[in-house]
């Protein structure tokens, strides 16, 4: 780890105090995570520090080329100078959350974040945390106008958490609130392409989808998928065996126009975590309810790359809000 820290510090160079430092380390350094921030803070200065362990790390090499490194020791550090920004960072326990039926003010007070100084949030969550969906729903409820980016950190076998905050390793969640003269605009490249029609959920138990409909036709998710498979190529059917996901409609995502359904919705890709061959049901890694639209998705690198490029080009077309920097959060 010391060598990785020296290399990162050498690339960043000596500079004044940054406003925000984002640190991401591969799980190859899991056992050394408690030493990481103290090592970095001896050489680099920032008002706020947060980050996470990841299965893959994205960053820029010494020669200026971007790289994504997976399943190998890697470290990425980003220092941001944001003059005029109102920044606040907090570490929160997720074991006891406010009631989702309570007031937005209760959630705001629990988080310790001021909604008047919160235009954007970076939200990182430990994979061992409880109530993850409730936490995200609560933050959306309490800060409806704040763009949120982030993800769930990667699990590991070391006896501590996966999140980095100030000079320590924590569990639960860490949140960086950004306001004032700065905001983060989120775009989502799904890494997948849709297959088959858009279905409506007819029956569901918690996160287990029991029945879907396509117009007047109703059937189990497995039966719907079998009909889709009949129209796929042999190569696509092979992809389904290891790269199948479910897209769940979200109407507040910024995606490219070709990723919108006929009603203008967008689909947030979620992992399928189980199939019941007895009743044809599927379990999905998200909370779903009857009436939601869903669509099966195949993971595809080219589709993700093209979509990301289109989104980034579109983000530069508004002359009144030209982007100054970009943050890439790669996770499902």
What are these regions (language model features)?
Residues 1-20, 25-34, 39-41, 47, ...:
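Small-residue-enriched flexible segments
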């Amino acid at each position: 780890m010391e060598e990785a820290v020296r290399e990162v510090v050498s690339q960043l160079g000596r500079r004044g105090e940054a406003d925000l430092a984002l640190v991401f380390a591969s799980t190859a350094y899991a056992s050394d995570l408690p030493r990481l921030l103290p090592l970095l803070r001896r050489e680099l200065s920032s008002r706020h520090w947060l980050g996470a362990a990841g299965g893959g790390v994205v960053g820029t090499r010494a020669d200026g080329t971007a790289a994504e490194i997976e399943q190998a020791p890697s470290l990425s550090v980003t220092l941001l100078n944001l003059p005029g920004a109102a920044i606040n960072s907090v570490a929160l326990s997720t074991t006891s959350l406010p009631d989702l039926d309570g007031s937005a003010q209760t959630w705001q007070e629990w988080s310790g974040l001021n909604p008047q100084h919160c235009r954007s949030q970076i939200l990182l969550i430990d994979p061992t945390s409880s109530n993850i969906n409730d936490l995200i729903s609560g933050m959306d409820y309490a800060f409806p106008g704040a763009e949120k980016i982030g993800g769930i950190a990667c699990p590991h076998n070391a006896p501590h958490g996966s999140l980095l905050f100030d000079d320590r390793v924590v569990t639960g969640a860490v949140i960086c609130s950004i306001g004032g003269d700065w905001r983060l605009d989120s775009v989502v490249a799904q890494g997948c392409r849709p297959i088959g029609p858009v279905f409506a959920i007819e029956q569901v138990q918690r996160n287990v989808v029991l029945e879907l409909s396509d117009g007047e036709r109703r059937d189990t998710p497995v039966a719907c998928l079998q009909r889709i498979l009949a129209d796929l190529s042999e190569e696509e059917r092979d992809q389904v065996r290891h790269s199948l996901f479910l897209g769940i409609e979200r109407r507040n995502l910024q995606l490219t126009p070709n990723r919108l359904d006929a009603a203008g919705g967008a689909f947030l890709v979620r992992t399928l975590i189980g199939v019941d061959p007895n009743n044809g049901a599927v379990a999905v890694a998200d909370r779903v309810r009857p009436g939601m639209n869903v669509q099966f998705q195949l993971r595809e690198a080219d589709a993700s790359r093209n979509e990301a490029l289109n989104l980034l080009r579109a983000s530069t077309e508004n002359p009144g809000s030209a982007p100054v920097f970009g943050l890439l959060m790669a996770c499902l």
